[in-house]
């Protein structure tokens, strides 16, 4: 039920006016979800690129414990007709924390490309697939996806996908450099951190999942009766405020129930000391734990970043920490278990 709930609330936020965007420029980008849809001009046509991860919820824990092999799906299609472009050659680069993990050519005659990620502890990524004889680009073997095996998705946080379109309609004709659309996208891998907190002599296990960056310093404040944790964050207000960029911070906190930290039945949330209770969502379906979601969209992130820069006296670009606090409260966000029993995951067609 946790996966279903996570998918439903993320999809609902994707349909919100605050998170919907379509840009028609040579280079477009977003900032972190399980799926992004970006648009760019392609001559006299508008090309949309859909990038999505399957399954939608991937974490370092599911990769390690379940040997999960997530797939990244790319679909380039005409915005007006909704038909795939044919003979598409993609030049795809994947980065993590500024380090290039993969950079290569991929081709699909039908415009749909699927890359299966096989996370492994090895020095570099190896790519397995048929080589197209014209473009010397990796393509699928029958119905099997291209496979990228190596040190990818082993760490949680944001992964940067840079996708350049080299051919469309005719695989033998490479588009001029100044006519090649470039899409910048960020997909999130959940970083799982566990801690045991001493609450008035009782040991309470807590799990925090971040879909933005690594979590650190999980503590309990007895005076405030709060669970606290931190996350690295770039307070680059120019990047955050860019109309072309979506920013979405999703954190999950798992709290056993009944326990001193779930006894009130509801929760208040704070980010950098700012009350964000209105963006908390609580999954109460599980009888043994509450799963509390911080779902912070771009307008709130902009305000939090602006206040942080004012307090620190910094300029528009600074690397720092973002703090989170969660407090059990009868006046906070309550569990939404009853309404979620009828929710089903959405299967978005390629």
Label each PLM-derived region with a short phrase.
Residues 1-31, 74, 269, 332-350:
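Secretory targeting signatures
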Residues 23-87:
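Beta-strand-rich domain onsets/edges
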Residues 33, 167-203, 343:
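Short beta-strand elements
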Residues 68-72, 225-227, 245-251:
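Structural beta-strand segments of beta-rich domains
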Residues 166-173, 329-335:
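Short acidic/polar inter-strand loop motif in beta-rich domains
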Residues 239-263:
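Surface-exposed beta-strand/loop patches in extracellular or lumenal glycoproteins
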